[in-house]
Amino acid sequence: MGGKTVTRADLVEAVYRKVGLSRTESAALVEMILDEVCDAIVNGETVKLSSFATFQVRDKNERIGRNPKTGEEVPILPRRVMTFKASNVLKQRILQEHQKRQGKTSK
């Protein structure tokens, strides 16, 4: 399973090849998009990218956790976390790719 990790440089290269911008312009475009997404998330806004996913910030209340080594109860402070929820379109594409790969390996 798994494969390679896609980096910013990979995204820049893909924009360069598919859109036809220069590498410098492609890098600037990728950075602008990522900055906009990050700024929105940091400001508590929901980012919904149709057919891809929704990024959302959630508040988690304080709760009691347990130290796994000692069993001692430890308070876990309230915090904000980001959630990623894949769209149904993306989930379906992942499932289809998985089924396609399963079909190749079972022959």
UniProtKB/Swiss-Prot annotation:
InterPro entries documented for this protein: Hist_DNA-bd, Histone-like_DNA-bd_CS, IHF-like_DNA-bd_dom_sf, IHF_alpha
Keyword annotations from UniProtKB, A to Z: DNA recombination, DNA-binding, Transcription, Transcription regulation, Translation regulation
Gene Ontology MF terms in the entry: DNA binding; structural constituent of chromatin
Gene Ontology cellular component terms for the protein in this record: cytosol
GO biological-process terms attached to the record: DNA recombination; positive regulation of metabolic process; regulation of DNA-templated transcription; regulation of translation
Functional note: This protein is one of the two subunits of integration host factor, a specific DNA-binding protein that functions in genetic recombination as well as in transcriptional and translational control.
Subunit structure: Heterodimer of an alpha and a beta chain.
UniProt similarity note: Belongs to the bacterial histone-like protein family.
HAMAP family: IHF_alpha (MF_00380)
NCBIfam families xrefs: himA, PRK00285.1
Name used for this protein in its record: Integration host factor subunit alpha
Gene behind this protein: ihfA
